[in-house]
């Protein structure tokens, strides 16, 4: 039984300048990033690399159409390295760009063509949530299928994962919270996954501690205090990525995908809507497994009784990021059934990682409670 894989070499630099100079970014490199990152942080240190801004191809979550249009614009140009500097959307797209190109990226996500890596991939995350710099997963909205779908393959691992706290310090508050909540959920779902083991647990627990303790300090000292402890979130997110990259995530992510895909809710925010409700259901189904350890861990960090762990967690997170019923994002009541079918049909890759199996009825009931 394989216990742990950490495929990329992990680097950390204080500044973008240090990163650009160390990796000698220049001719033969393709940088995928955002203009608001490129202009202040990267442009003056770029020695001839082609730079493309992801937002030119559309806003929000990555999609198969976005990927197709970028590949079309690349045309016959040949690159040695793909360098992703950005959040989850940039990273997910860059992973696909590191592969041998196909006419339609939908074929990759639907398994119709093989994944063949033919370029080095350097990932520099600029949010503190995806952990995607150390995972072999890429997720995109499939426009023609009206859902989000992920593919997992070792061909998608980065060659180098590079942590640069300078990027995170300027992250707008809303993006900081939604991305770091996503990291917390990665760590927690990975901890209760049937694929978890002592190695992944070590990364999960430390990630949960770093992120939750950081949140508690922010509530006490103000939201701007996050800049003082930003490395805790950067490292915590990376640890969470290592955990879920090996153990997987489950129902929280699976049920959130139709919401994110159809109503363009940011990924971390969509996950947060389902987080505590699904873990309460897990506990009702089987209170004696690892969910008991999660409750104990949360209670210790949040200084509450184990029976109040999820309520206390919700109270803490609600102070940082407000939640709304699903209907306020645009979801229609009749979509409860269709979304449940969509999850069962398209998200088995995630559902197999559930702490306890979720029936169609469980999925429908979860949507109803949150509607």
UniProtKB/Swiss-Prot annotation:
The keyword Oxidoreductase applies. One of its GO terms (molecular function) is nucleotide binding. The keyword NAD applies. Optimum pH is 6.1 for the reduction of succinic semialdehyde and pH 9.4 for the oxidation of 4-hydroxybutanoate. Its EC number is 1.1.1.61. Pfam families: ADH_Fe_C (PF25137), Fe-ADH (PF00465). Inactivated by oxygen. Binds 1 Fe(2+) ion per subunit. Binds 2 Cu(2+) ions per subunit. CDD domains: 4HBD_NAD (cd14860). It comes from the Bacteria. It catalyses: 4-hydroxybutanoate + NAD(+) = succinate semialdehyde + NADH + H(+). NAD(+) binds at residues 88-92, 126-130, 148, 267. Homodimer. Belongs to the iron-containing alcohol dehydrogenase family. This is 4-hydroxybutyrate dehydrogenase. It comes from Clostridium kluyveri (strain ATCC 8527 / DSM 555 / NBRC 12016 / NCIMB 10680 / K1).
């Amino acid at each position: 039984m394989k216990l742990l894989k950490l495929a990329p070499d992990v680097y950390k630099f204080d500044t973008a300048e240090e990163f650009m100079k160390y990796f000698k970014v220049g001719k033969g490199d393709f940088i995928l990033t955002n203009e608001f990152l490129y202009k202040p942080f990267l442009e003056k240190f770029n020695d001839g690399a082609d730079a493309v801004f992801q937002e030119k191809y559309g806003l929000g979550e990555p999609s198969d159409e976005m990927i197709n249009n970028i590949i079309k614009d690349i045309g016959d140009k040949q690159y040695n390295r793909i360098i992703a500097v950005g959040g989850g959307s940039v990273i997910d797209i860059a992973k696909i760009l590191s592969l041998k190109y196909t006419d339609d990226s939908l074929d990759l996500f639907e398994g119709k063509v093989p994944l063949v890596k033919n370029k080095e991939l350097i990932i520099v995350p600029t949010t503190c949530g995806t952990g995607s710099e150390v995972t072999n997963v890429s997720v995109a909205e499939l426009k023609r299928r009206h859902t989000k779908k992920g593919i997992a393959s070792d061909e998608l691992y980065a060659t180098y994962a590079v942590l640069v706290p300078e990027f995170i310090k300027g992250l707008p508050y809303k993006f900081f919270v939604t991305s770091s909540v996503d990291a917390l959920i990665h760590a927690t779902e990975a901890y209760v996954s049937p694929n978890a083991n002592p190695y992944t647990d070590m990364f999960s627990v430390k990630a949960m501690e770093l992120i939750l303790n950081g949140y508690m300090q922010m509530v006490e000292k103000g939201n701007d205090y996050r800049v003082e402890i930003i490395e805790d979130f950067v490292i915590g997110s990376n640890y969470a990525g290592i955990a879920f990259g090996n153990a997987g995530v489950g129902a929280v992510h699976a049920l959130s995908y139709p919401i994110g895909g159809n109503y363009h809710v940011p990924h971390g925010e969509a996950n947060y809507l389902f987080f505590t409700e699904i873990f309460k259901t897990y506990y009702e189904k089987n209170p004696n497994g690892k969910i008991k350890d999660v409750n104990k861990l949360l209670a210790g960090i949040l200084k509450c009784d184990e029976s109040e762990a999820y309520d206390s967690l919700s109270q803490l997170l609600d102070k940082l990021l407000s939640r709304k019923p699903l209907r306020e994002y645009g979801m229609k009541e009749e979509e409860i059934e269709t979304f449940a079918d969509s999850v069962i049909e398209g998200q088995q890759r995630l559902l197999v990682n559930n702490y306890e199996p979720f029936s169609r009825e469980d999925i429908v009931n979860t949507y109803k409670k949150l509607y």
